[in-house]
Amino acid sequence: MKDTSSKRPKSKEANKKKTKDKSNADNLPKPEEAAASEPGHPEYIFPLVLTSVSQELFGCRADEDVTAENPHKLLKKQDIIQDLRHRAAVCDFSPVKQAVLDYPEDELLLVFDRDFIYGQSFYLVLTVQAKESILKPPAEGADEQMEDEEQQEEEEEMMTKTPEPQPWVSLGSERLVYTPSAVLSSVICVRQLRYSVCPLGRRSGTRVRFSDRNALDWKEELVECSSYEDKSFSITRMERDSSTQTCRDNTHTCTQTLWKKPKNMWSQYEPREFSSEEKQHQLQSENLKNFITSVARRFEIYLQQNLIADVFCDDWTALCEDDASLMGKTETQLKEYQSFMDLHFSKEKTISHVQWHPSISGVIVVSMMERLSLEERIDSSTKLLLNPSHILFWSFSDPINPQLQLECPDDVLCFQFSPSDHNIIAGGCMNGQVVLWDISAHVDRLQDTRSGGKNILNKLGKSDATPVVRYCAVSGIENGHKAPITDIQWLPETFEVNKLGTPVENQSRTSVQLVTCAPDCCVLFWDLRAPRVMVHSLTDIKQKQEEKPLENPHGVPNTFTHLNLTWKPFIRVSLPKISSSGEYSPLRFSMRENTVDYNTGDKSVSGADSRVFAQLRMQSAKQQKPLQNISTKLYIATEDGELVYTDWKVEKDNDSGRMLSAKPLDVFLLQDTLLHTVSRSPFFRDIILTVGRFSFSIWREGLTCGPLLMSVYSKSMFSAGHWSRSRPAVLFMGREDGDVEVWDLLQNSRQPSHTQNISTAAISCIRTQTSSGNTHPYTETLHTHTHTQPPSAAYAHRPAPVTHTHTHKHCTHTHTHTHTHTHTHSRHQLHTHTDQLRVLEERVREAKQNLLAVSDRLGTLHILQIPGSLRRSSSSERQNVEKYFEKEEERLQYFEKRQSDHQKKKKETEAEQQKKKTELVTPPKQEEEVNAETLKEYQQFLTLEKLILKDMNIQNETQQTCNTINTP
């Protein structure tokens, strides 16, 4: 029996792998090959720039000592170190100083790189292996012979040998075959093993060569277990159990009692009292005396405690007013809440004005205008007529599509909602016309946006297209402004103005007048009511009855049909200059908020429900009741940087008999450029903010010394400014570079407390969120109660009137009651009640006013969320701001007094000097006159001496002595 053995052939991949490993281990790549394969240079070389001095010093001059045929030069390590010591950083080998010091041998290889393969003319070899590989490259014949030997060995290994017969060698397996007791038999196959013994390369003296290896060939050396998709998770289920629920998890609802017709009511009642006999019996009873005696001491203690400390103070609310102080940091970053931009109406346009809807939360209105200069506007006038401008109503529920569009006859620069009816909007156009809109028919669409469009039943049968509302009336071009209207404001519903500018009582309690200004040097007053009905002839009445009503294809409301194209102002206030001829050019104006007048009578019941402007008529002069507590002063900002303080009343000229405007009361020149913002503080009626191109100022009405605060000149020009409605000390400023500055006057009045970039274009308008009637259901049921009651029991037997004033959302009611029973109240209860109401109002205001609208010149509206540190005010912030303004006012008055005293003293000094100059210079006296005066003085002295001697009885004795001496 013969055993045959054969060698198992190897695969081709293994042979290739082995060959590649050997080649990589034996061959070191040349620098040229490494430069071609890698983007930089290999790690074992360093490119150098050698100056001519260094080349001569080391004997490696280019194209002389080293050439392209013989580029190698061996440098001694000690010479390089010596050069580094002498020249230090000037030495060309200073970048590789550490590599030279760490080099193990005494000579380093320097190679001349004539072709600038590595970017420089020389490169230094930093390793010994690389130096040997460059100086002694392997011969091509030896490499080929080695490859042939390796290939021959591989072929021999792969060749299958034929088995040959061999003699039998007994190993004991035949015993198992012939043994009968063996149950199992096994056949043992013996194979001959072949071993290959090779000596170690380090002992045999074989040269070892290493080479670089490409990082992309790692797959041939490793076994990768790559990820794959598990099919067990891709099995589709034929059936699946699911459930749906139709009701919403959360819903916001509110309810409010509808009170259509408020009335003034009075009620009087008297408590039940004891009779005189019963009172006498109770006062003389022992029980009453014992009770008073037992509680008298405790009552005195309670009264003392009540006077010493406020027992009704809430320590928890007074503990910490700002949450940021607990966390140790204050958040001042404005976060973008939403942004609005329409691809059609906002393209190549800018936002000129922004207003929050006063009664519908989440709705904001913007006016769009063309971004053109005057010359471009004239050239494209035909295109502008075919594409009218619009005012867009945006809602938070739909940031892509506007909810409503108001068509405008021209670009609108400013607009305002009527304070009486928020569906009436007045706007000022660029051509000088005043426009009126009525959106009463589309209020439901705007109110549906508050629910996020979830009311599907109201949307059935309605189109998704944005409705376009045409203007109801427009003023005549010949009777209006001759320049673009830059500002417009409504007069409050508490008063109106007659033709002389005098405030009179508004019996209709409806805002029917508005004020506009333009750079045409005038301020105009407009009235929405029709003029008084005049006596018409029978022919005119018959002709009017025969006229057919005009068709209304656009569905324009007939609210202001009586004003369309015939509307003209009833007061024209001019602004003559004080010191020279000419007039001021107004851009913005600010009126004092005269919303309350205590001389005004009760609200007229007949005019309370009248909302049809066409039925309202102007009052006659006899029916008008003048009001004395209404301020008629205006602050006007001009395009020349002047702040004008004037009165809108007109006076009759005695010479010409014409109605003329008086000259302004004061004029302040602030800047050389225009003032684009004049705004009153929502917390202080007499504090005004003015913003120019380079700085802003804060003024107090009636103070003529100057501004309370004037900021330093800014590097970037200001383009907008606005007061914060939640904190009295905070201002928001917009700049031309798209940044928004936040100023906190209590923190730092010289620089902004926070600056943040909002847009890449200039900021055009800034508006904080105003109070909305439907913001929160709790705000609709808010009432303010003021109780005036006797503070002591001393009025127990005297009927005391108790007045309850209820301030509701739409009206004010006064109820007067007469109480005849005893009221015992503490003064702290009244203060506590007032403080609680104030805190409640501040919290409601905080919930509403946490958004800031910022628009830019590219037509984008940014809605920013105001952080809590800029939204919540402390309980004493208003008092601190007021004290700050008072100190600034005292400072101005002090400096004004010093200046006046200095000028007065200067005038007195000049007068004295002038007086001395005008006095005549007396000529010098003659010698005779001097002698005569001296003799006269001597005679006066002798006379005085005689009188003194005579009084002392010395003169007689002297005379007698003289006579005795003279007698013989």
Curated annotation (Swiss-Prot):
Matching InterPro entries, A to Z? Dynein_IC, WD40/YVTN_repeat-like_dom_sf, WD40_repeat_dom_sf, WD40_rpt
Q: What Gene Ontology terms describe where this protein resides (cellular component)?
A: cytoplasm
* SUPFAM superfamilies documented for this protein: WD40 repeat-like (SSF50978)
Keywords on this record? Answer: Coiled coil, Cytoplasm, Repeat, WD repeat
The entry describes its oligomerization and partners as: Part of the multisubunit axonemal dynein complex formed at least of two heavy chains and a number of intermediate and light chains.
Please give the function described in this protein's UniProt entry.
May be involved in the regulation of cilia function.
What is the name of this protein?
A: Dynein axonemal intermediate chain 3
Originating species: Danio rerio
